[in-house]
Amino acid sequence: MANFLLGWELGGGLGHAGRLKPLAAGLQARGHGVTMWLRDLVQTERLLADLPVPRLQAPVWLHRTVGVPEPQVSLAEILLGFGYLQPHTLRPLVQGWLAALRLSRADAMLVDYAPTALVAARIAGVPAASVGMGFWLPPAQVPIPAFRDWQPIAPGRVARAEQQVLASINGVLRHYGTAPLPALWQLFGGDLPLLCSWPEIDHYPRAPDEVVDWLGPNYLPEGGQPPQWPAGDLTEGDGQNDGPRVFAYLKAGHPDHAACLHALVAAGCRVLCYLPEVTSGLKPPVLSPRIHYASSPVDLGLAFAEADLAVCHAGQATVAQALLAGVPLLLLPMQAEQFLMARQVERTGAAINAAMRPRPAGFGAMLDQLLTQPACHAAAAAFAQRHAGFHHATQVADLLDRLDGLARRANAAGSVPAKHATP
């Protein structure tokens, strides 16, 4: 048996902790020790409340970095804004993760979007696995491709940022007497990359000869309240089963969230909407008998079993569960990672990426296409059929088997946690 440190450093929302939760529970059930170091302890408290493992605050960058291009166009530029500008700004974060390894007496590490933890693991000689989607498990290319590829990028910009980040990492590694990192892409996967995606929803183009082990999306498949669909407008028809059922997971930060809800009502839809800001007390943006606002997160498996359409911001967990249920999507991405996901899903024919349409957004026409034309439903059904053999429980068991192998590797190497590198 081994002690695992589970870490999350970058990114927001609940998806990162949601990916780690079933793996933490599974490792513990198999007799391993687990300690979680999380970017956000407050927002994840409810999600992880039933998980009996120690949870501590991860070492994270708290400052605004001057001199980083806006907006960032590559993973390297993101890292420049999170402490990787110079070796002396990165080193304290690495020291924090080294301390986390010592305090956890870690024999092995599993991270979700935690590159600095992976730097520390290289220094400490701790075998490390990295789980997640393609955005932070990039292709084996130098430099790593830009993700904001829809806008002009000055020649050499991506390569220069990557060289600067690599210089900072290698400066820290040199301080600890550790071999340099040859290429930045080699950092993100650690010793055991666990790419939880499929080619159709991958964020990057990958070379045909790159060997990729596609494990399918990893998410929490259950939990939340059962779906409660509105009855519809009692003045129209019999008021029962009136109009297509649409599950909408929206956030008030998107400028078109209210316009989209108005369009759904105008299209005669019955909308079950989870809008986190409303659950926190914000006045609902659109009031209609055709919209029911959920008071807490909804069980997506149950919702998509009954839905005719999904509307969301293109987070992988929501998109994957909709597609596996054969439900087409209207996607309203809020940032680059989501835009890439939305673009990929639209290419399958199973979705419309609203961010690719002219503004002001013509939601009426988009909804008409998604609800009345068979092509999108057929594409979503075809996606579900292609991946009909995918089951979350089987995937989790496979991931745990791989992590067991990492633990055996740690034990064979004779890892001695007390001797992890010190400042």
Residues of each region from the PLM?
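Donor-nucleotide binding loops and adjacent catalytic segments primarily
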Residues: A24, D202-L309
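Conserved nucleotide-sugar phosphate-binding/catalytic loop shared by glycosyltransferases and other
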Residues: V34-Q86
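Conserved nucleotide-sugar donor-binding subdomain of glycosyltransferases
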Residues: P71-L110, A114-T116, R157-L184
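Conserved nucleotide-sugar donor-interacting segment of glycosyltransferase catalytic cores
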Residues: R91-P155
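A donor-sugar binding/catalytic signature common to diverse glycosyltransferases
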Residues: A108-Y113, P138, P297-A342
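Active-site-proximal region of nucleotide-activated glycan assembly enzymes
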Residues: P127-H203, D209-E210
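C-terminal amphipathic helix plus adjacent low-complexity
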Residues: W185-L187, A365-P423
